[in-house]
């Protein structure tokens, strides 16, 4: 994916490898968001996947939301994010799975309401 060289360059210039091979990118993504840079990533995702039908963009709660939102601007579609906990106001019908957080070195149980992901939709 040569198109994402902008991301590779940003990681090389601003990212830090922490013990356990965890990539720290808090200067532009998960503590402070470099909005113009993330917007450029959104454009790159549109270039990479623009020839495909996309109805929604799915990400996980936290660091993925910024990238997903700015990518969604270029696709003109909504963003759905997997929540790390099902609150009392969440629908009972939901998709659920476990994902590994390498940042926190633990598995998280995540959920998405079935109300927002329908059969036949094309999800990026």
Go through the PLM ranges and name each one.
Residues 1-54:
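Active-site-facing substrate-recognition patch
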Residues 33-37, 58, 100-105:
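Short, flexible loop segments at the rims of nucleotide/cofactor-binding pockets, characterized by
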Residues 44-45, 58, 75, 81:
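A glycine-rich, hydrophobic loop/mini-helix early in the fold
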Residues 53-61:
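Short glycine-rich phosphate-binding loop at a beta-alpha junction
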Residues 58, 123-124:
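Short glycine-rich or small-residue beta-strand-to-loop segments that form or flank ligand, phosphate
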Residues 66-75:
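Short Gly/Thr/Asp-enriched flexible loops that form oxyanion-binding sites at enzyme active sites
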Residues 78-123:
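Short, glycine/charge-rich flexible loops or terminal/linker lids adjacent to PRPP-binding catalytic cores
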